[in-house]
Design a protein with these regions (language model features):
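Compositionally biased, intrinsically disordered low-complexity segments enriched
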Residues: 197-219
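Non-transmembrane, aqueous-exposed alpha-helical and coiled segments at domain scale
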Residues: 1-198, 217-434
Length: 434
């Protein structure tokens, strides 16, 4: 069994979806494993001839080639959003994707999303740059002891699930609202209790778009406060996720189950520089491990190890969201770089930002740090020291830049990067196949 991890080298948006799809299409009997974050990923795959284009959020990139997806127990699926993604996928490709999930994967709830959106709105100019998909709030809720697993959601009745969500609101969410500074709009404080007693009079929440522009509101006027006190929001959530959980086949993904596959492709969300422990860019990070950490633990539990880690980068750097971006510049200052069709301007992350790579040393540093991080797992009591995987850096979109990478110190030919990587034990490539 061959095991491969696909990882973003920078801040995300490097071409991980393209890479996973290429691997899945060329390797026999593959399984795509989603292992970090949740529904906030946006991995784009396009047909080489331009016949179709699809953005994968939770469905593995490569599912278009009939390759199944597994949600590992460290993945936090957003079952509220999954239904639409499966519908769009099925309409485009003509078949429903095969989706497995470990039974103890922890779901993201509607209140996680609303808390996330409300917190970002309350932060104003100090936003973290979140996607607004509730991952940090899902992590916090689980840490407080209020988790809900996929198996629980699947086996509970609608009423059981609704009761559990109400309990979480009563015992936990109210405290979290205060911590995050999400306050009721002054004009609606008197209406709040009325809406709770009579949910039919409250508006139905929608998380597909932001209901207001943040520049209009302050901490004292946060529309998400009302939604977090609206029982109809929970009722609609329960109805949707109880239907969407039927799209998953729950499995015990032990070694015996995995042996039906010849290749395991670990599709990682975000990028190394957004890892929850990459202090340099705190607090503008994601609430998950974005390197080989989760993969190493998953495999070690099953007596397996990681064979290869592929770190994906563009010839330049992008960042979608707030936070430091060294060597930042306007896209027009990067010759040949075209518009990004996936990362469109939005309320939560703003406009996609561009930069040059800092230096050769900084270019390789995150990969070396990630490689060395697995040596720490034994000291953390999480796993034995694994065999180190083969390391590769895949540079995508070199056709935009004439086979060179843009660095602050000047443009560097790809071949020069290759030679520098060889000295560090890292293979640099510009194409990926089986």
């Amino acid at each position: 069994m061959r095991t491969i991890a696909v990882i973003g080298k920078n801040f995300g948006d490097e071409g991980k979806g393209f890479t996973c799809s290429r691997l899945a299409s060329s390797l026999k009997k593959s399984l795509i494993i989603k292992h970090n974050g949740g529904g906030q990923a946006g991995h784009t795959v396009e047909d080489p001839e331009g016949k179709w284009r699809f953005i994968h959020h939770q469905i593995g990139a490569g599912a278009e080639y009939h390759v199944p997806t597994l949600f590992a127990d460290s993945f936090m699926p957003d079952l509220f959003q999954l239904g639409k993604e499966v519908k769009d996928f099925t309409e485009l490709f003509g078949f429903q994707p095969i989706l497995y999930s470990e039974k103890n994967a922890r779901i993201t709830t509607i209140d996680d999303v609303l808390l996330n959106m409300g917190a970002e709105l309350a932060r104003g100019k100090n936003r973290h740059g979140s996607c607004g998909m509730g991952i940090e709030e899902c992590v916090q809720r689980n840490a407080a002891g209020y988790g809900i697993t996929v198996e629980e959601l699947a086996t509970w009745s609608n009423q059981d699930l609704l009761d559990r969500l109400k309990q979480i609101r009563k015992e936990y969410t109210g405290r979290r609202i205060k911590i995050l500074g999400i306050q009721a709009p002054a004009s609606s404080k008197a209406m709040k209790q009325s809406n709770i007693r009579n949910p039919s009079t409250a508006s139905t929440a929608s998380t597909s778009s932001n209901p207001t522009n943040s520049s209009t509101f302050s901490n004292l006027s946060n529309p998400y406060y009302e939604m977090l006190n609206n029982e109809t929001v929970l009722e609609n959530f329960v109805e949707e996720v109880k239907e969407n959980v039927k799209l998953l086949t729950l499995v015990d993904a032990d070694r015996k189950w995995l042996e039906q596959f010849q290749h395991l492709i670990f599709e990682t969300g975000q990028g190394l520089l957004l890892d929850q422990d990459y202090e340099t860019y705190a607090p503008h990070l994601t609430s998950s491990k974005t390197g080989i950490h989760n993969t190493a633990i998953f495999l070690d539990k099953r007596g397996l190890s990681l064979d290869e880690a592929i770190y994906v980068t563009r010839p330049y750097v992008t960042r979608h969201g707030n936070g430091p971006l060294p060597c930042e510049m306007d896209r027009s200052e990067l010759p040949g770089v075209g518009e990004d069709l996936t990362n469109q301007p939005n309320e939560w992350q703003g406009t996609l930002r561009y930069a040059k790579h800092e230096s050769l040393e900084a270019f390789f540093a995150p990969v070396l740090r990630d490689r060395d991080s697995v040596n720490c797992l034994e000291r953390m009591g999480e796993t034995k020291r694994p065999d180190l995987p083969k390391l590769a850096i895949l540079v995508t979109q070199l056709s935009e830049t004439g086979n060179q990478l843009y660095f602050d110190e000047g443009n560097i030919p790809f071949e020069t990067i290759q030679k520098a990587g060889e000295e560090l034990g890292i293979s640099c490539v510009k194409d990926i196949g089986g």
